[in-house]
Amino acid sequence: RIVLWTLFALVLLVAPKVFTSSLSMTMLTQMGIAIIACLSYNMLLGQGGMLSFGHAVYSGLGSFAAIHVLNKVADGAWSVPVSLLPLVGGLAGLLVAALLGALTTKKSGTIFAMITLGIGELVFSMSLMLPEFFGGEGGIASNRVVGEPFLGITFGPETEVYYLIAVYTFVCTVLMFAFTHTPLGRMLNAVRDNPERVEFIGYDTQRVRFFAFMIAGFFIGIAGGLYTINFEIVTAEVVGAHRSGAYLLFTFLGGALFFFGPIIGAVMMVLATVLLSEMTKAWLLYLGIFFLVMVMYAPGGVSGLIMMNLRLAAYGMLRRLWTSYLALAGTLLVVLTAVGVIVEMIYHIKLNEAMGPEMTFMGATINTQGADAWVGATFLLITGVGLFELVRRQFVHQWSQIQEDIEAENLRRQMH
C-alpha cells in the first residue's frame, strides 16, 4: 500500500514535467479536481448504495462560496489565503449537505434518487432567480492573483495552480481511502448491503447515511473550491443536472466497486470532455455507445475488468486468454471503425454540408455522397459485429473454464 501511495504521489509530482504543453496542463488540473469529485460521489454510490442525481449542487455551491470569498479578498474586506479557498468550498458543501441531507437521507433507494434529482433541479432554477448570489447568466468572475505572495507563490502561473490542486488531490484521496476503513465507513457498507440487519442490531441507518452524505459534501465542496481557483469564473452550469450526470456516468465507467475506479473514471471524464469533444461533434453519441457496451459486457467498470484479470494473473491463468483478448480487440477495432465512419458521414451531411461532400476520417478522404462509402462501412460493420460475437462466445466459454479451474485449485489448496 505504501508503494502504491508513493507511486501516486510521484505521478502527481512528475506529470507536469512530462506533459508540458498548455493543453496538457489544463487537462491535468481538471483531472485533479475530477478525481476528488468522483471519489466523493463514490462515497455515496459505491460505498453507501445511494444513487444521487444532484451531487453537483454541493460542488457548485462550494464554488460559489469560494468565489464570493475570493472577491472579498480582492476588495480588501477579508484576508484569506488563496490556498485555503478550497476549504471554504468544502465547508460550504458540508453545510449545504447537512441542511439538505437531513431530508434526503430519510429515504433510500429510488425515493432517495428522486429527491436528489428534485433538489438539483430546484437549486438550478434558483440560480436564475437569485442573480445577486449566482451572477445571472454570466456568472461571477474573479482573479486568483490577490493578496501577498506566500514564498513567492502567487498562483498566477498554471503550474502553481496545478501543484495546489495536486496537494489537495493527494490529501483528499488519502482521507477518503482512510474513511473506508473507519467504523463509519464499514457501517456504511453494511447499510448498503443489508439495512434491515443493521437496524435489527441497533444502528440508525438514516444517521449513517446522513453522516456519509455530509462527508461526501465536504470533499466535493473542496473540488468546487479548486474549480474556482482554476477557472476564475463560476456560472449556474456548475449546479446543473449535466454536471451531476457526468459524476454518475464516469464513476460508473471507472467502476464503483473499487476505490481506484472513480480515479480512472475522472481521467476518462476529462479525456472525453476536453479531447474527444474537440476531435468530433459526435462525442456524446460515442460516449453513450461506450456506456451501453460497458453496462452490457462490463458492469463493474474498467476497475472491475482490471481486478478480474489480476485475479487470473495471480493463479497464472491469464496467459490462456491472450489470444482471445487479441481477437476481441481486433474485431472491436473493426466495429468501432465502421461505426465511426457511418456516424461521421451522417454528421458531415447534416452539419457540414456547405463544406462539400468530402470529409477526412483517420487520414482517409471519404466521399459522403458515394454509395461505395456507405456500402463499405455497412459491410464492415456487419462483418465486425458477426466476428466479435463469435469471438465473444468463445471467450465466455474459456472464461468459464478458467473459473472452474480456479475453484478446483482452491479446493485442492484447502485439502492440503
Feature-to-residue mapping (PLM):
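Transmembrane alpha-helices and adjacent helix-loop boundaries
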Residues: 1-416
